[in-house]
Amino acid sequence: MYAAKMDYGFPVRTPPPPDYPAVPVADAYAPEPFAPEFSARRQAFMEHVLRNPAPANLKAPFHEMARLAAGGMPHHGIFYAALDYIDERKDCADFVLHAVLRLLLQFADRLDAALLDRARQTVLGFKFWPDEAGLDSMCTWTENHQILFASAAFLAGQMYPDEVFPNSGHTGRDKMAIHRPRIQRWLDLRFRTGFSEWLSNVYYDEDLTALVNLIDFCQDGEICQRAAVVVDLLLLDVALNSFKGVFGCSHGRSYEAQKKWAATEDMADTQKLLFGRGQFSLQDSMSAVCLALSERYRMPRVLYEIANDLDRAEMVNRQRLGIRLDEAERWGLGFEDLEDGMVYLSLEAYAHPRTINLFARMLDAFDWWENEFFVPFGARRGLLSGARRLGLLPLVARLFERDITRNTREEVHTYTYRTPDYMLSSAQD
């Protein structure tokens, strides 16, 4: 399979402040809940942040924001590195942007004027959706990225309602009006169908970051309420499919490292913060910081009890997640509209016989032929465009469906079996 060659480098150009932690201090693994109350778990997490340097990756600004909230001296060079990363429109800039938005919305009174002005310019200048100007290789279309981009656009528009965002020409109010339906549709599909990136020990972290930022800062009460419901449902997924702090079930999307070593799971810190088991790793987490700093979301106590209900002899959890492409109409989806196309791409249905014509149109509409993720399609642009003009793309896709749709995630049925001593999990067609 083609692997995009992306630059996720996060260079920090200034030294840390005096007395900044030099080396990581490992957290102790807790096989049993180490504190029954969230306030105590939150305090332990914040103390762990203060003892440790930020990770050397693009999640670093979240940890420095937590350090600031905990009364420590943050590494301001990391905040400026975050702004550089966003300005360069590197892949996952939307992750970093959510740290900047929370920083501005929750801690602006603790930032100097120069950093505030630079952050404002970065937010106003960002490319919030693939139909806006500029060539880049940001992934905007997977399930987690869609809510990250749409929620960031809405919150940015809310912050600067009368400002013009120069990359699109939209005012902030325009941004809110454009992205509100996208947020609502995403929330509706998660509530009705669950996640295409089901039970992901990587991407649930990203989903939570966007959703908790909406809950905390969005002034639209309906969006806040619906986002909180989806967070509850997502955390129910985690509670039902985890074992002693490890989100060790079947995953719709994950990576080798996170499968081999639970401490590298993006959800590791969130598990220990919310459920009391596991380990604070500070390696690749955003949502733990957002949940620890949230002033408006508190997880229902019953989810803590479910996650820690390991005394019964056995527990079986069966779930259905996602949609079937042959039932697209059931979910209000067609095969002409680019907005529907974004829903299909959240399933990674690029070259499916039912979606390939629409996907080819999206490559044109969004100038995606040069996007690093779509290099294999760009190399065959002439062939694909010709086949599309002749109406042959669906036929070609059908002939090679087994090979070219292997990443597509349609409806899945998961089965998790948990006992006091072990947990097994599988995904079934």
Where are these regions (language model features)?
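Exposed alpha-helical structural elements
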Residues: 99, 114, 118, 182, ...
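Extended hydrophobic/Leu-rich segments
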Residues: 1-12, 34, 38, 45, ...
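Non-membrane alpha-helical secondary structure
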Residues: 34, 38, 92, 111, ...
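A compositional/structural signature marking long, glycine- and acidic/polar-rich segments
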Residues: 162-280
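Extended polysaccharide-engagement surfaces of secreted carbohydrate-active enzymes
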Residues: 225-429
